[in-house]
């Protein structure tokens, strides 16, 4: 119910309408499993309000922002916008948060002869909010070594040329950031 209230509150904040409805939801996703279940649920609630009360006028980016605000302020999850935006767009995308560019990614696994399988490992992301919330600060910390505010402004070659203590969490996170971006064309 916190996410539903949060979505309604965020919609109120942007001047969008909302109201009551009856719904039943079933899911086989475990809460805290790392599959963006809270982002997907918040996006779903926003889309329902958007369709019922706003003639579907909110664009996917606005829907994602509403969902993010609901998670941040009402669900206690200090998340970014990536999961909500991917859920709102409904497809695999490359998102450059520095430029705002969003590029669809061809994820037709069957055409490539692959099958995407999800496995329940029994792990949980529940309780990781404090560590997760430190990610933006860690990224800015590394960026500050190069006189930049955001890690996306740093040249990866400059980052890799510097001698780092690779056991430091901010360094590992920055390396992951650059490695992930290098994987996407």
Language model regions located:
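Gly/Ser-rich oxyanion-binding loop with an adjacent helix/lid
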Residues: 1-109
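C-terminal nucleotide
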Residues: 10, 17, 91-185
């Amino acid at each position: 119910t916190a996410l539903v209230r949060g979505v309604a509150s965020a919609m109120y904040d942007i001047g969008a309408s909302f109201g009551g409805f009856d719904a039943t939801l079933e899911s086989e996703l475990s809460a805290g499993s790392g599959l963006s279940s809270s982002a997907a649920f918040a996006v779903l609630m926003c889309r329902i309000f958007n369709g019922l009360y706003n003639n579907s006028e909110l664009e996917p980016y606005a829907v994602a922002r509403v969902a993010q605000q609901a998670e941040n302020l009402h669900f206690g999850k200090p998340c970014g916008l990536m999961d909500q935006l991917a859920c709102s767009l409904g497809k695999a995308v490359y998102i450059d948060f520095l430029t705002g560019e969003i590029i669809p990614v061809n994820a037709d696994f069957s055409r490539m002869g692959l099958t995407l399988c999800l496995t329940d490992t029994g792990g949980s992301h529940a309780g990781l909010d404090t560590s997760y919330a430190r990610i933006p600060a860690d990224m800015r910390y590394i960026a500050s070594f190069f006189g930049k505010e955001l890690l996306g402004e740093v040249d990866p070659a400059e980052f890799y040329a510097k001698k780092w203590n690779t056991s430091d969490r901010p360094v590992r996170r920055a390396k992951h950031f650059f490695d992930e971006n290098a994987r996407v064309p």
